[in-house]
């Protein structure tokens, strides 16, 4: 790493500590040329896979779209904001864990349905009705029957 004071690239790490609940490393460094000390922070850059839409187009992963869909399904339901954030983070982690550079949009939809099934059954049915394009009341009944098993 280049020294911010003199630009030399000979530096050494004096101290390292985990901060931000272990999601960041704070390093104390010293330049070997000018002996100045400074602090750096390191975080992992977590890249989300691209999304392959049903029409074949490719799009960047949009966390706001994911959050909006989940919040719409959970509207006026007794689920905490923390539980929603946990579900979103779990979905993102599972997508990254695939190791793929691109994932189909239906995979994301299925992960959302799994998360909603755990959080709130009514929200699950709401989301499923739109996601699976239910045509009539019979399809609602079939999905509810699956939940009751």
From Swiss-Prot:
The keyword Repressor applies. Keywords: ATP-binding, DNA-binding, Metal-binding, Nucleotide-binding, Repressor, Transcription, Transcription regulation, Zinc, Zinc-finger. The keyword Transcription regulation applies. A zinc finger (unnamed) spans 3-34. Its cofactor is Zn(2+). Binds 1 zinc ion. GO terms for biological process: negative regulation of DNA-templated transcription. GO terms for molecular function: ATP binding; DNA binding; zinc ion binding. PROSITE patterns: ATP_CONE (PS51161). InterPro entries: ATP-cone_dom, NrdR-like_N, RNR_NrdR-like. Residues 49-139 form the ATP-cone domain. It holds the Pfam family ATP-cone. Negatively regulates transcription of bacterial ribonucleotide reductase nrd genes and operons by binding to NrdR-boxes. Belongs to the NrdR family. HAMAP family: NrdR. This is Transcriptional repressor NrdR. The gene is nrdR.
């Amino acid at each position: 790493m280049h020294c911010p004071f003199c630009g030399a690239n000979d530096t050494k790490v004096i101290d390292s500590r985990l901060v931000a609940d272990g999601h960041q490393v704070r390093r104390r460094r010293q330049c070997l040329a000018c002996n100045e000390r400074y602090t750096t922070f390191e975080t992992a850059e977590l890249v989300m896979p691209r999304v392959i839409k049903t029409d074949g187009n490719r799009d960047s992963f949009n966390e706001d779209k994911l959050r909006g869909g989940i919040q719409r399904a959970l509207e006026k339901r007794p689920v905490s904001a923390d539980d929603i954030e946990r579900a979103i983070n779990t979905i993102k982690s599972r997508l990254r864990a695939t190791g793929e550079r691109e994932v189909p949009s239906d995979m994301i939809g299925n992960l959302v349905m799994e998360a909603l099934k755990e959080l709130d059954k009514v929200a699950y049915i709401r989301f499923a009705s739109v996601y699976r394009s239910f045509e009539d009341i019979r399809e609602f009944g079939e999905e509810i029957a699956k939940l009751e098993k």
